[in-house]
């Protein structure tokens, strides 16, 4: 089971109530704060345990973010922007809130996408350098303390979150990590023959154990699907393997004087394998909301 992401929210209660409904489930653990002192105390206690900050865009948020920046305590963050009318009033009266170059500003109209945006915020955070500058830095924000402890904090956080993000992404990105030299279409004629013979042997074993109670068929299915996936094998090749084996079994049944109807049940094997393969492709193609190179950084 994946460990949940620990999110820390500083926002008014009406915003917190809305976000609790968005982060239902066991993929995220949301800690909410309305009082600035409580929020600061939580951040200073165990900042390394926080996976992402969610901060409502208002003047009250500025002091604590300035303090974190000055201390070199940089964390993934999403700034929740209120409606345009409320935001206009805020920016007219207060300085712009900036924390670091990897922060994400999310308008209220897109708050429903927060579970996905959290992953993106963490992915952006992984690219922060030890010396992080602010865009359009104002004179009211002193330069950060760049010492060994702050650099160590950033690097340790990035390493921890990279592992956590990789755990959550699973097979995502594997699609583009496959080696063309391992693709079936690039095999030599002899390699193709040996590969298909091996795959056909595996398929036979799956069929013979599919309706047994030994509990090994899932491992056999996974092994077969993995080989087909990384060889970029065409579905037509799998269908051909299935039909050849069914023809072979049909001949045996005829010689024994038995009905061929039993072979119809083995269509379930083909459906199961194609479903597994389709799911692997679905899970492996990178999501558009995650920067492409993060799939390689989390290796």
From Swiss-Prot:
Subunit note: Homodimer. The KaiABC1 complex composition changes during the circadian cycle to control KaiC1 phosphorylation. Complexes KaiC1(6), KaiA(2-4):KaiC1(6), KaiB(6):KaiC1(6) and KaiC1(6):KaiB(6):KaiA(12) are among the most important forms, many form cooperatively. KaiA and CikA bind to the same region of the KaiB(fs) form and therefore compete. Interacts with KaiC1 but not KaiC2 or KaiC3. Interacts with itself, not seen to interact with other Kai proteins.
Region (Flexible linker): 170-178
Record region (PsR domain, binds oxidized quinones): 1-135
Domain KaiA C-terminal: 179-287
Family: Belongs to the KaiA family.
Gene Ontology biological process terms in this record: circadian rhythm
Gene designation: kaiA
Gene3D superfamilies (UniProt xref): 3.40.50.2300, KaiA/RbsU domain (1.10.1240.30)
Keywords, ordered alphabetically: Biological rhythms
UniProt keyword Secreted, yes or no: no
Domain KaiA N-terminal positions: 1-169
Name of the protein this chain belongs to: Circadian clock oscillator protein KaiA
Description of the deletion phenotype: A triple kaiA-kaiB1-kaiC1 deletion grows normally under photoautotrophic conditions in continuous light. In a light/dark regime has strongly restricted viability and impaired growth behavior, and overall decreased pigments (after 5-6 days); phenotype is more extreme when grown on 0.2% glucose.
Role summary: Key component of the KaiABC oscillator complex, which constitutes the main circadian regulator in cyanobacteria. Complex composition changes during the circadian cycle to control KaiC phosphorylation. KaiA stimulates KaiC autophosphorylation, while KaiB sequesters KaiA, leading to KaiC autodephosphorylation. KaiA binding to the KaiC CII domain during the subjective day yields KaiA(2-4):KaiC(6) complexes which stimulate KaiC autophosphorylation.
Native organism: Synechocystis sp. (strain ATCC 27184 / PCC 6803 / Kazusa)
Pfam families registered for this protein in UniProt: KaiA (PF07688), KaiA_N (PF21714)
Domains: entry comment: The N-terminal pseudoreceiver domain (PsR, approximately equal to KaiA N-terminal) binds oxidized quinones. The KaiA C-terminal domain mediates interaction with KaiC, homodimerization, and is responsible for the clock oscillation function.
PROSITE patterns for this protein: KAIA_C (PS51431), KAIA_N (PS51430)
């Amino acid at each position: 089971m994946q460990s949940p992401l620990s999110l820390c929210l500083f926002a008014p209660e009406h915003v917190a109530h809305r976000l609790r409904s968005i982060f239902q489930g066991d993929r995220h653990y949301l800690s909410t704060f309305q009082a600035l002192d409580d929020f600061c105390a939580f951040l200073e206690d165990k900042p390394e345990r926080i996976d992402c900050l969610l901060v409502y865009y208002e003047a009250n948020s500025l002091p604590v973010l300035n303090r974190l920046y000055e201390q070199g305590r940089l964390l993934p963050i999403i700034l929740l922007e209120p409606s345009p009318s409320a935001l206009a009033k805020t920016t007219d009266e207060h300085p712009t809130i900036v924390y670091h170059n990897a922060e994400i500003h999310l308008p209220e109209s897109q708050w429903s996408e927060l579970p996905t945006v959290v992953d993106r915020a963490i992915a952006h955070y992984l690219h922060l350098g030890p010396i992080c500058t602010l865009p359009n830095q104002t004179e009211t924000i002193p330069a950060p303390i760049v010492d060994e402890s702050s650099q160590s904090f950033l690097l340790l956080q990035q390493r921890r979150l990279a592992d956590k993000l990789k755990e959550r992404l699973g097979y995502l990105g594997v699609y583009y990590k496959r080696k063309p030299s391992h693709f079936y279409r690039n095999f030599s004629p002899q390699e193709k023959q040996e590969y298909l013979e091996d795959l056909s042997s595996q398929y036979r074993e799956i069929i013979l154990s599919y309706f047994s109670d030994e509990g090994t068929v899932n491992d056999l299915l996974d092994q077969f699907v993995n080989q087909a996936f990384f060889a970029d094998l065409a579905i037509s090749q799998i269908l051909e393997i299935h039909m050849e084996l069914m023809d072979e079994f049909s001949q045996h049944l005829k010689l024994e004087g038995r009905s061929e109807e039993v072979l119809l049940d083995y269509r379930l094997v083909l459906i199961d394998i194609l479903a597994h393969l389709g799911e692997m492709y679905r899970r492996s193609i990178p999501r558009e909301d995650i920067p492409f190179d993060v799939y390689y950084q989390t290796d």
